UniProtKB/Swiss-Prot annotation:
Organism encoding this protein: Entamoeba histolytica (strain ATCC 30459 / HM-1:IMSS / ABRM)
InterPro entries according to UniProt: SapB_2, Saposin-like, SaposinB_dom
UniProt-listed SUPFAM superfamilies: Saposin
Name used for this protein in its record: Pore-forming peptide amoebapore B
Cellular compartments annotated: Cytoplasmic granule
Record flagged with keyword Iron: no
Gene3D superfamilies documented for this protein: Saposin-like
Keywords on record: Antibiotic, Antimicrobial, Disulfide bond, Signal
Subunit structure: Monomer. Homodimer. Hexamer; formed during insertion in the membrane.
Annotated signal sequence range: 1-19
Length: 96
């Protein structure tokens, strides 16, 4: 019985770690995309992009959107404008 419980706990922990890695990678890719969008089209385009994206999002993307919106789009834009590394940005919004 203890072995089964141990295996279940391990499996849950592994799945959570894997999901965390997926969310972190998705966040880093999104930050890079937003960085390019910000450079080309400006902050208003970033706000519009995130609004459109998060309006349709589900799954991991929905989770990431919740974190971004909770953190604040303007704060995200400031970090990106200040050339903060995507990993650090994602850590600040609790996606990594």
């Amino acid at each position: 019985m203890r072995a089964i419980i141990f295996v279940l706990i391990f499996a849950i922990a592994f799945a959570a770690t894997r999901e965390g890695a997926i969310l972190c990678n998705l966040c880093k890719d999104t930050v890079k995309l937003v960085e390019n969008l910000l450079t080309v089209d400006g902050a208003q385009a970033v706000r519009q992009y995130i609004d459109n994206l998060c309006g349709k999002a589900s799954g991991f993307l929905g989770t990431l959107c919740e974190k971004i919106l909770s953190f604040g789009v303007d704060e995200l834009v400031k970090l990106i404008e200040n050339h903060v590394d995507p990993v650090v940005v994602c850590e600040k919004i609790h996606a990594c």
